[in-house]
């Protein structure tokens, strides 16, 4: 009987050892190494940089432009002006260091290199609008956390999940301004977090670098 050539163990497939696991088991022990190698290519490889820049340029281009389309031209004009004001770094970024377009460009890059990024919604006092964004790298998820805040839930990879595998909270490591890790992580409810990553399998719980399939070739 002839089955699938892809499943044969002949000369062409010799040495190709594979097995099936859940996405989380497959990713868990490789995620950090893949991310570190992707970042090394980002820093040191001209080919890697050309890929990253082309991706960012094609995905984001010159940035977002809001086009309000209410029935009132006056309201449309006011909303457009307010949007432009909010996009300034002092209004949209909790650190006041990046404009909204710069934030989005960085997010596109971190998505490709790191596999994802977390946006935390921060509600502030005062300002143009009492709302700003905080960007958190996926490294800052506390993978040592194991005790859920809610009975019946499970903590995996620094994220608390309910029985339906829905994220309900994030354990975030804390660092001082010089980058030294502090002892106690902060728990942030999922309703305040916007995770940006690509889910490729139903059993996948966290991100993996988009560069994973090409890292060995680029190197």
What are these regions (language model features)?
Residues 1-70:
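N-terminal-proximal low-complexity accessory segments that begin disordered
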Residues 42-201:
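Structured, mid-chain assembly/scaffold modules that mediate subunit interfaces
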Residues 196-219:
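Extended, charged amphipathic alpha-helical segments
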Residues 9, 22, 130-132, 138, ...:
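Generic N-terminal initiation segments characterized by hydrophobic and/or small/turn-forming residues
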């Amino acid at each position: 009987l002839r089955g699938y050539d892809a499943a044969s163990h002949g000369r062409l497939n010799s040495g190709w050892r594979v097995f099936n696991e859940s996405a989380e088991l497959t990713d868990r022990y490789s995620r950090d190494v893949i991310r570190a190698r992707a970042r090394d290519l980002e820093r040191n490889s001209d080919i890697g940089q050309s890929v990253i820049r082309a991706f960012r340029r094609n995905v984001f281009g010159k940035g977002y432009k809001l086009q309000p389309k209410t029935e009132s031209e006056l309201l449309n004009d006011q909303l457009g002006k307010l949007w432009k004001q909010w996009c300034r770094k002092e209004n949209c970024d909790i650190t006041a260091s990046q404009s909204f377009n710069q934030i989005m460009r960085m997010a596109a890059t971190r998505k490709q290199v790191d596999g994802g990024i977390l946006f935390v919604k921060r509600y502030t006092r005062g300002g143009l609008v009492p709302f700003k964004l905080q960007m958190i790298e996926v490294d800052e998820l506390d993978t040592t956390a194991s005790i859920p805040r809610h009975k019946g839930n499970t903590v995996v990879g620094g994220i608390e999940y309910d029985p339906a595998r829905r994220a309900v909270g994030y354990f975030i490591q804390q660092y001082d301004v010089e980058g030294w890790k502090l002892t106690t992580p902060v728990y942030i409810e999922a309703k305040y977090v916007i995770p940006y990553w690509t889910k490729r399998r139903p059993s996948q719980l966290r991100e993996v670098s988009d560069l994973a399939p090409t890292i060995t070739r680029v190197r």
